[in-house]
Amino acid sequence: METNSCLKMQVALTLLPKFNTQKYLTFINRCGGIEGFFHEKTHAFSTLLKEYQLSFSDERKSALKSAEEELKNLDLYDIRLCSVEHSNYPFLLRQCEDTPLVFYYKGQLVTESLPYLAIVGTRHASERCKIRVRTILKELAERGHRLVIVSGLAYGIDITAHLSSLTQHFPTYAVLGHGLNLIYPAPHKNIAENILRQGGALLSEYPCSSPFIPQHFLQRNRIIAGLSQATFVAESALKGGAMATAHIAASYGRDVMALPGRPEDIFSKGCNELIKQNIAALVEDSSDIACLLHLKDKKSPPQQTSFNFFDTGDQEKQVLKILTQQGCTPIDELSKNTRIAMNELIALLLKLELEGKIVSLPGKNYIIS
């Protein structure tokens, strides 16, 4: 068990200026370990800084003092630390030159040998793409696969990936760009709690005292990519966090995958470009992901057939029949034609959408998927 003093020094490392992790580790070893690093005399420390061509002021004392407050936060918010020298530090993340020396986490780090897949994309995800993400994860589960899904808890594709993981009982990691004493965006707090309840984790390289800075969200993308065997871009414009994550993953030598989209769709242009530049493999369905991750089916693959009305309840049959005959239909008209109470109809439509049978469109309209 680590001493309070050792934990304090690990926290203090996260409060010092950032530079190359491998250089930091070599530097610490030259000082005789983390304790030597923090207690090396000022003159000798300055000499080492010059030798390593580093120029930051000696902030070790102030970092140690601030770390005392951070330790209180660890207890208060049930947050733990993982150092790059710990045996449970994620293997793939450790291989990255810019891996964090220490990161904070809540929940459980998966010790089981499972493939890690990052799923990223725009915050303005289309309903059609969200359904495709849900369907892909559902089919992977039906094939008997179990994965760790990594994303960033943001709106759009991120939260769809986390929710779909929870539905399929996959552990999922949410990598955050702020301290773990808060959840952003706030409406996702309940989902974050469900992630913890279902054996996943929230991760951040930032201490609780770290201010909420937009640049942190770009920095955290390298951790999403670094944790993962492959990064899957579901939907993205030409610029944005998902594209940055894809390029970082490629720079690490990891596989990148993307869903193609219509050329005129602004949030398909990024995916199409990744495929066109041979940065990403084209993904059409779950079998493509299984192939790229070298997964062997443990169960019979799901049948790629359209749904059968006779597999559903009477109310579902009514809704599906109307949508098949009429095409795009507003919810008010569905309620009128089926005589299903509005509150029951809303629940039924959500169920059908999650099953990938229908798609919701703006203005509370619905069509067959």
Regions found by a protein language model. Give the residues of each.
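Short, small/acidic-rich helices and loops at N termini and domain boundaries
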Residues: 1-88, 274, 355-357, 362-369
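Glycine-biased, small-residue-rich flexible motifs in mid-sequence functional cores and linkers
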Residues: 2-4, 83-369
